Amino acid sequence: MDRKYRILIVDDEAPLRAGLQTYLELEGYEADTAASAEEALTLDLRSYDLILLDIMMGDMSGIEMAAKLKADKATADLPIIFLTARDSDDDMVSGLNLGADDYIAKPYSIKNVLARIGAVLRRSDRRK
């Protein structure tokens, strides 16, 4: 990894956030967490290279947060990978049509998550 990428993990499940953060940091990423979409939206999201975003959360879903990000010129190009326990084609298509860069169904293997993160970041770097 040439530079340290910043990744934000947005998920309402604390053990999942902590586990992902640990694995990402062991792989050389800088990883921050937010327990909700509302909390994430208070951060300077432009400082991140990628967001791992759970779809099913409390007051605001990951889909709603992604729509806000894509509607804002400052964050419209920010790569998003959806994480969800709902593994339906309709959910996957909705997320990808909204502008997500990938979609990972829970439960997942960390190797799969790391490979997908790497692929999305490589594509994002080529677009810059």
Describe these PLM feature segments:
Residues 4, 47-49, 74-79:
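His-Asp phosphorelay/catalytic-motif detector in bacterial-type signaling
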Residues 11, 54, 84:
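Active-site residues of response regulator receiver
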Residues 14-32:
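Two-component/phosphorelay signaling modules centered on CheY-like receiver
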Residues 17, 53, 58, 67, ...:
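The feature encodes the CheY-like receiver
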Residues 33-50:
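Acidic, metal-coordinating helix/loop segments flanking the phosphotransfer/catalytic sites
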Residues 35-36, 61-64:
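Acidic catalytic/metal-coordinating carboxylates
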Residues 108-121:
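C-terminal output helix
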